[in-house]
Regions:
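Flexible gly/pro/ser-rich segments immediately N-terminal to CXXCH heme-c attachment motifs
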Residues: 25, 49-52
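Classic N-terminal secretory signal peptides
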Residues: 1-18
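Axial heme c-ligation environment in periplasmic c-type cytochrome domains
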Residues: 32, 40-50, 66-93
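Sequence/structural segment immediately N-terminal to covalent heme-attachment motifs in c-type
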Residues: 19-36
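Aromatic- and Gly/Pro-enriched helix-to-coil junctions and flexible linker segments
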Residues: 94-101
Length: 101
């Protein structure tokens, strides 16, 4: 049931045409806290994209996802995400999708 809710959330967040990056974000649990266009526990992908617009932020955001932390968007900390949870290639693709939101 939990998996069904996560998949349904991802489809709502990204539309029916979810690609590999969106699938990786769903499997890694990103969609439990984030959505494309509204704040949940974590900030909306569109807000993250707006904050880093015009910057070469892929490596910076990949590090933030890996290490976790707080302070970038407020006091709620982001949990660290290991390579076992989302591999480097999927993480890079996911961050690129987020920055295009």
């Amino acid at each position: 049931m939990k998996a069904l809710l996560i998949v349904a959330s991802a489809l709502l967040a990204f539309g029916a045409q979810a690609g590999p990056a969106e699938d990786a974000m769903t499997k890694a649990g990103c969609m439990a806290c984030h959505a494309k266009d509204k704040k949940l526990v974590g900030h909306a992908f569109k807000d993250i994209a707006a904050k880093y617009k015009g910057q070469d932020a892929v490596a910076k955001l990949m590090e933030k996802v890996r290490k976790g932390g707080s302070g970038s968007f407020g006091p709620i900390p982001m949990s660290p995400n290991s390579v076992e949870k989302i591999n480097d290639a999927d993480l890079k693709a996911a961050v690129e999708v987020i920055l295009k939101s």
